[in-house]
Amino acid sequence: MNAATKAIAAQGLARRAFSLGAVKAFDNALQFLLPVVLVRCLDAHTFGEYRLFWLAVGTVMALAPLCMPGALYYFLPRSDAPTRRLYIHQTLAFLACTGLLSALIVSPLNPWMPAALDPLAKYGALVPAFVALWVTSSLIDFLPTIEERIPLQACATISVALARALLVAGGAWLTADMGIIMWLLLATVLLKFALLLAYIGRFHGWGRPWFKAAVFGGQIRYTAPFGLASGCYMLRSQADQWVAATLFSLHSFASFSIAAILSQVVNIFRASVIEAFMPSMSRLEAAGDLKSMMEMNARANAMVGRLLFPILGFVFAFAEDLVRLIYTASYVNAGAVMRVYIAGLAVLVVEVSTVMQLLRQGPFALGANVVVLALSVPLSWYGGVHLGLAGAAAGSVSALYLDRAIMLNRIAAVSGLPVHRQQHWATLGRHLAWTALATAAAWACVHGLLAEANALPRLALGAIIFGAIYAPFNLRRLV
């Protein structure tokens, strides 16, 4: 590949990354704005039930898919059409089975259902029905992107996001009834499931074979270690929320979960960029070009850091003002939790899970994540008991740093590439330093000039000062 071809390919990847980023930004913006409406329509107890419901769904999604949809990034680009169809059919069948099992676990019929979920038991079959369909239809969140049909991915994502936001917000506004909201969420997931079936039928069909034991065995052997490792990783980020749900009232848990929404901002940048780069990284690994694969990962992470660090810095400086403006003063204690989270979210700029997957390091990742999860839960519990609501986030933050240290050293051992050469550390450090400078300057000016002002003028002045310092030296080029 000559220099001109490489440049064109790089530009195409960047455009694809930003296209996916725009779609995911829209989706996450709606998910971000929806609670803004709900806190003004629902009382604190009902809003706590809504957040608890999504925590339960998120925990199911950490384990039930077992990374089967994401692993298609590995299998589909290197397979012919009949084999691709087989992989897709097997993945769909697997998700349907794990979805049904998950539905049983969160059902009131389960005698071992966690006590923290008792507030949801009164909604009967609505919760398990939603869970079963949500797990099964999650394949549509991956498949068009894996097959590089970005416009179709955009249509599917935007359609479901709009339906969910409009139906739930409308139901809350008109009725303030969580039971009605549950029925509307069920309608949304039925739309998502229909889109998945239509996509598979249009591009792959339903022809036989639907299942081959040998092929499925290879698929599950490749996927299971990564799925379990990913599940442990996601459970680490949710464990502190379960601690908060167990130790504190639904109102306090709702405040804690509002702070956790910040992680969605991180996922916008990480997921969109990595999903755009992943097919090309997979092809490079298959061709044996490990150095180029690592360079592509480093470029993706530098792109994420350039945009993510300033967002985290601004939120760190003005957390309480943001909560008052967006979620009302009733949930202002989320501000302290946000600051604790930001200390950990910054390290997520260095995304290495895709590299571990392509290097087939699933068993190691699983073991590491089990160890880190076992350490994070007691830390969160101790922090919650002795330090209050913000202390409950300590476990997941500590776990993030330990995880990155372990994974970077493992990649160095397997690839022969030292840690200091795996990422564009100097670039990331420069963005972080400018973020720290802009954060400190914006905070000092606002607290000096508008100490007693309302949230909006404080945020406006802070944003102007922050942007004036950070943007000229870091955002001149985005690609």
Language-model-derived ranges and their functions:
Residues 121-125, 154-202, 218, 222, ...:
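Hydrophobic alpha-helical transmembrane segments
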Residues 59, 63, 96-100, 104, ...:
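Alpha-helical transmembrane segments of multi-pass membrane proteins
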Residues 108, 160, 371-375, 425-479:
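Transmembrane alpha-helical segments of multi-pass transport proteins
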Residues 1-13, 151, 155, 178-182, ...:
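Interhelical loop/hinge segments that connect adjacent transmembrane helices in multipass membrane
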